[in-house]
């Protein structure tokens, strides 16, 4: 029977949830959720000087926005330090690690001499095979005994087989002289203890895999499945940085991108399923696999992100979309909508969501429904309200006051009125938009009338006719 899949996301709490980290978390989440497995969260907070509670919270908030729920309790790597140290002592007792008394000055002198002579700077400790009786009463580190012959093969699900000669591996430090464990050891022990079966992470960790395999093998533990995914680059092909724009997941939340669209885009960033660009969360969970991840760095493309976000907004249920739009206003520091405005936003949703790519665009398109009387037209719309058009609106309004308020009937009334004026409805649209919304670019006049209702529509037309 195949063991259940267990993946993990293991960020360091030294800043916000980077867009690359968000994608790594998403890939792990999709792989586990699509296979009925577990997705675990570990905070790698061993660097006490740089780790902060605020950064941890920012990571959690970013994951919550993206809907990446984790199983079980959050694991703190720092809290497991005693366990990591105990494992190092196990290896020492088993003869698979040793005490090294070399000082930093001695190691630095060795490397300087090696560079000067054109030799490898890989440090070979003279203490590896030293008898215990020769050990001085001095500070020491614990080093693993790296294999000195043969090869280590990283069987990676994305990069393929990566072979490293064992004579290129050093006797890595496991425990510092102050008794604290190093990151390499902590990661292996935590992944083992958490039951992680698949390690999906950035390919900047690929070289670490060979060193971590030394620890797995020395302990007789099963090595997890490796999947080292390519990094994200900017549109210019260079590593993603601030010059390319926003880097943090929450920055995109504050800018008003829908979480579903961001999930879809991040999933497609380096992974593909045929020619499918737009897909639902359920489809992503079903389709996601490691075989579909490419080796080359993916390029972040804001236009593609916006396109997918627009499709997700258009496909969303109106009630859910209204809730998301209001949540966006809260996180971006904007005033909450009144109960009346919230109701009107919900009514307008059907006619504004088709072309909005972000929540600011969506709310802007709902301006006609959210604004209060009297409607003040902007400069461009005001040009449509000259004396002639005001007179036309004044004449039109009585014909609407007792009308049956359905689209077909409203279209018939306005087209007949335009015909009576020996013109086309298009000529009336400008003044009507200005009167109803105060703008020249709006949803269709008929949609605005249906959303506003007969009383508000006629009141706005009367206001504009004065």
From Swiss-Prot:
This is Glutamate--tRNA ligase 2. Catalyzes the attachment of glutamate to tRNA(Glu) in a two-step reaction: glutamate is first activated by ATP to form Glu-AMP and then transferred to the acceptor end of tRNA(Glu). Gene3D superfamilies: 1.10.10.350, HUPs. SUPFAM superfamilies: An anticodon-binding domain of class I aminoacyl-tRNA synthetases (SSF48163), Nucleotidylyl transferase (SSF52374). It comes from Roseobacter denitrificans (strain ATCC 33942 / OCh 114) (Erythrobacter sp. (strain OCh 114)). The gene is gltX2. Belongs to the class-I aminoacyl-tRNA synthetase family. Glutamate--tRNA ligase type 1 subfamily. One of its GO terms (cellular component) is cytosol. GO terms for molecular function: ATP binding; glutamate-tRNA ligase activity; tRNA binding; zinc ion binding. It comes from the Bacteria. Keywords: Aminoacyl-tRNA synthetase, ATP-binding, Cytoplasm, Ligase, Nucleotide-binding, Protein biosynthesis. A motif ('KMSKS' region) lies at residues 239-243. It is found in: Cytoplasm. ATP binds at residue 242. A motif ('HIGH' region) lies at residues 11-21. Monomer. Its EC number is 6.1.1.17. HAMAP family: Glu_tRNA_synth_type1. It is an enzyme of class 6 (ligase).
């Amino acid at each position: 029977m195949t063991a259940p899949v267990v993946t993990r996301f293991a960020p360091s709490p030294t800043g916000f949830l980077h867009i690359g980290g968000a994608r790594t978390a998403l890939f792990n989440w999709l792989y586990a959720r699509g296979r009925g497995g577990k997705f675990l969260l570990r905070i790698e907070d061993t660097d006490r000087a740089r780790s902060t509670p605020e950064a941890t919270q920012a990571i959690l908030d970013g994951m919550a926005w993206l809907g990446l729920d984790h199983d079980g309790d959050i694991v703190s790597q720092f809290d497991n330090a005693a366990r990591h140290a105990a494992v190092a002592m196990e290896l020492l007792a088993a003869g698979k690690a040793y005490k090294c008394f070399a000082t930093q000055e001695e190691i630095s002198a060795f490397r300087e001499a090696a560079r000067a002579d054109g030799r490898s700077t890989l440090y070979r400790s003279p203490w590896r095979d030293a008898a215990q009786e020769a050990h001085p009463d001095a500070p020491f580190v614990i080093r693993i005994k790296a294999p000195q012959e043969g090869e280590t093969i990283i069987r990676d699900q994305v990069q393929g087989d990566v072979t490293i000669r064992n004579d290129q591996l050093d006797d890595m430090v496991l425990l510092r002289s102050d008794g604290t464990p190093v990151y390499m050891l902590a990661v292996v022990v935590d992944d083992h203890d958490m039951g992680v079966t698949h390690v999906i992470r950035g390919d900047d960790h690929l070289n670490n895999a060979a060193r971590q395999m030394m620890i797995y093998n020395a302990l007789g533990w099963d090595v997890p499945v490796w999947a080292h995914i390519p990094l994200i680059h900017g549109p210019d092909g260079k590593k993603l940085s601030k010059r390319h724009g926003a880097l943090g997941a929450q920055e995109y939340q504050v800018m008003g991108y829908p979480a579903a669209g961001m999930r879809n885009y991040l999933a497609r960033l380096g992974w593909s399923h045929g020619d499918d660009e737009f897909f639902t969360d359920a489809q992503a969970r079903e389709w996601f696999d490691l075989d579909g991840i490419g080796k080359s760095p993916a390029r972040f493309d804001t236009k593609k992100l916006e396109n997918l976000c627009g499709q997700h907004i258009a496909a969303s249920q109106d009630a859910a979309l209204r809730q998301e739009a209001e949540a966006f206003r809260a996180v971006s520091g904007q005033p909450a909508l009144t109960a009346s405005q919230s109701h009107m936003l919900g009514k307008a949703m059907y006619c504004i969501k088709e072309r909005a790519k972000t929540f600011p665009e969506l709310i802007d398109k709902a301006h006609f429904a959210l604004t209060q009387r009297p409607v003040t037209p902007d400069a461009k719309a005001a040009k449509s309200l000259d004396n002639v058009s005001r007179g036309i609106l004044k004449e039109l309004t009585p014909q609407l006051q007792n009308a049956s308020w359905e689209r077909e009937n409203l279209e018939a009334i306005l087209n007949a009125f335009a015909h009576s004026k020996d013109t086309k409805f298009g000529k009336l649209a400008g003044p009507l938009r200005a009167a109803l919304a105060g703008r020249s670019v709006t949803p269709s006049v008929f949609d605005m009338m249906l959303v506003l209702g007969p009383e508000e529509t006629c009141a706005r037309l009367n206001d504009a006719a004065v």
